Amino acid sequence: MLSASEGEQTVRLARNTIESFLKDGEQSDSIDLPEVFGELRGVFVTLTKNGNLRGCIGHPYADSVLESAIVDSAISAATRDPRFPMVDISEMSDIIVEVTVLTQPELVDVLPDKLPEVIEIGRHGLIAKMGMYQGLLLPQVAPENDFDAIDLLNHTCLKAGLPQDAWLTGAQMYWFEGQIFKEVEPRGDIEENKFNSCCK
């Protein structure tokens, strides 16, 4: 688990990276960060503006060190999310930055009809995989949208471009947990959002 101070630094790194890139087209200079930023971690950066999603991209798997994963995800969330136009620097005073540091996804090894019984809302995020299709929902999505376990399974499959009941018909479901750090207001204090117990 990251400490509160380390979590705060994840969000500041994400914001500083975005603002530097939008101003100059360059990444901000590397700064001295705690040891955990050199560990392999999955991470997502989420941007919201006036309560609405403005960008969300990340690394589901621990394929990069945390610092690099945050930098890449932050720039991508602001400039490469295909659902939204590129963020303009003038918007950053209205955007809340959130960073979710992930545990390594693991296959949920139960019979499909038992999946709703083992998934814990607020604790588990999900990845649905079938063939070339893959989709992910972060742990905070379910409590933020009042989903139960079946809703979460259905929406994860839809995110993957699959039928919503694909979790019953052959899709592999992976779960993971996330430690969530978020600005209370744009450029404001940073708090850890705890929907449930986390993490391994």
Curated annotation (Swiss-Prot):
Domain of life: Archaea
PROSITE patterns: AMMECR1
Classification via Pfam families: AMMECR1
Start and end residues of each AMMECR1 domain: 5-192
Gene3D superfamilies reported in the protein's UniProt record: Hypothetical protein ph0010, domain 1, Hypothetical protein ph0010, domain 2
InterPro entries: AMMECR1, AMMECR1_dom_sf, AMMECR1_domain, AMMECR1_N, AmmeMemoSam_A, Uncharacterised_MJ0810
Protein's recorded name: Protein Mbur_1344
Organism from which the protein derives: Methanococcoides burtonii (strain DSM 6242 / NBRC 107633 / OCM 468 / ACE-M)
